[in-house]
UniProtKB/Swiss-Prot annotation:
One of its GO terms (cellular component) is nucleus. It comes from Macaca fascicularis. It holds the Pfam family Homeobox_KN. It is found in: Nucleus. Its main location: nucleus. It comes from the Eukaryota. Residues 1-62, 126-192 are annotated as: Disordered. Keywords: DNA-binding, Homeobox, Nucleus, Transcription, Transcription regulation. One of its GO terms (molecular function) is DNA binding. Residues 55-118 bind DNA. The keyword Nucleus applies. This is Homeobox protein TGIF2LX. Belongs to the TALE/TGIF homeobox family.
Length: 249
């Protein structure tokens, strides 16, 4: 009788143990789908793996559309000496590129350090301008162009002032002096030609202080007068030769 009583009790305990083991081995059969996902996330967190997101939820951070970048690069190339847009220009670029104002500002901040120096070096300009702000770079460019204008025009003005007295050497003729006759002495001719040079030096000093007041009428072309002087000198030399020949027959 005791063996018969022990038999059913043992079978019950065995069945309970088997059921407990089955529940432990297969927990997914008794749990909901939400619990399954939570268990998977916990397991991934424990192992250090990040669950893969669907493709339509993936976003590329830090990359702008190629068309928008092309528009911004074209604008920077046209305004490379003032390579930072104003607020109105930012709004205009925002409409064209469909980007926000902060995206445009960040792009220009990075592009002025990375893209603009190479762009200016290809054009043969100084890449240091690209590191300055828009207004400062534009002001420095204007100052450099303004400073280069008088530097170029200065020597030309002095050359013109120095070259003018050379053409106006016989200025004394306009003051009433007469052309030397062929029979006059050579010393007198030299004094006549030397006197305008002294006057020219005085006019040269005044013209350096105010070169714009020099009139073109005072410095007319006296090439015909030079021809007359040369002819007179030649005639005087011929007369002297004739006198020497007459004195020594």
């Amino acid at each position: 009788m005791e063996a018969a009583a022990d038999g059913p009790a043992e079978t019950r305990s065995r069945v309970e143990k088997d059921s407990r083991r089955a529940k432990k081995d297969s927990p997914a059969k008794t749990q909901s789908p939400a619990q399954d996902t939570s268990i998977m996330l916990r397991n991934n967190a424990d192992t250090g793996k990040v669950p893969a997101l669907p493709e339509h939820k993936k976003k590329r951070k830090g990359y702008l559309p190629a068309e928008s970048v092309k528009i911004l690069r074209d604008w920077m190339y046209k305004h490379r000496f003032r390579a930072y847009p104003s607020e109105a220009e930012k709004r205009m670029l925002s409409k064209k590129t469909n980007l926000s104002l902060s995206q445009i500002s960040n792009w220009f901040i990075n592009a002025r350090r990375r893209i603009l120096p190479d762009m200016l070096q290809r054009r043969g300009n100084d890449p240091i301008v690209g590191h300055k702000t828009g207004k400062d770079a534009h002001a420095t460019h204007l100052r450099s162009t303004d400073a280069s204008v008088p530097a170029k025009s200065g020597p030309r003005g002095s050359d013109n002032v120095q070259s003018l007295p050379l053409r106006s050497s016989p200025k004394g003729q306009m003051s009433g002096e007469k052309i030397p006759e062929p029979g006059s002495a050579p010393s007198q001719k030299l004094t006549v030609i030397a006197q305008p040079k002294k006057k020219v030096k005085v006019s040269n000093i005044t013209s350096l202080s105010s070169p714009e007041r020099v009139s073109t009428e005072e410095y007319a072309d006296f090439s015909s007068f030079q021809l007359l002087v040369d002819a007179a000198v030649q005639r005087a030399a011929e007369l002297e030769l004739e006198k020497k020949q007459e004195s020594n027959p």
